A protein has these predicted regions:
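Glycine-rich phosphate-binding loop
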Residues: 41-86
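Short, well-ordered amphipathic alpha-helical segments that serve as non-catalytic structural scaffolds
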Residues: 7-16, 38-44, 85-86, 136
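Short beta-strand segments at enzyme active-site cores
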Residues: 29, 58-64, 105-113
Length: 147
């Protein structure tokens, strides 16, 4: 959803990570069909994502999305769901073994815009208020270095 905005946020995050020394081959981007599904995608990286037959663990996960308020309460439900999901991942970690729950912790950075209209989102995706994807990347670097 709102791909014009989320692509700008993601590119800002990627450019910032590379600028600060992260190798592009170490940046993995996953697309999910909607904002509510962001938490599931993040959980895969927290708990270890299989790639080329090997488990791959993230040093940090940046959850990027954009929810623009409409005429129904759906906005509130979506925003609450993704916020709560990210909070739970940060507080409780993810299971790195599905049979035996062993939590693994990894910072999950909330870079989801929740705006009243499209202009507010554009302003925060490289517009007059900067790029929240850039801020998410800086936060991810700082949090990964805490470990």
């Amino acid at each position: 959803w709102n791909s014009e905005i989320t692509h700008k946020l993601a590119q800002g995050a990627i450019d910032t990570l590379v600028k600060h020394g992260v190798k592009e081959e170490n940046i993995d981007v996953m697309h999910v069909p909607g904002t509510v599904e962001l938490t599931y995608g993040a959980a895969l990286y927290v708990s270890g994502k299989k790639k080329f037959g090997m488990l791959k663990y993230a040093d940090a996960v940046i959850v990027i999305g954009c929810v623009i308020q409409g005429d129904t309460p759906h906005f509130d439900y979506v925003c609450q769901s993704v916020t709560q999901g990210v909070t739970i991942l940060n507080a409780q970690g993810g299971a790195n073994d599905r049979a035996y729950y062993t939590p693994r912790y990894c910072p999950v950075i909330f870079s989801v815009l929740t705006t009243l209209d499209k202009q507010q989102a554009l302003d925060r995706a490289g517009g007059r208020l900067g790029n929240k994807g850039v801020e998410g990347a800086v936060t991810a670097i700082k949090m990964a270095n805490l470990l």
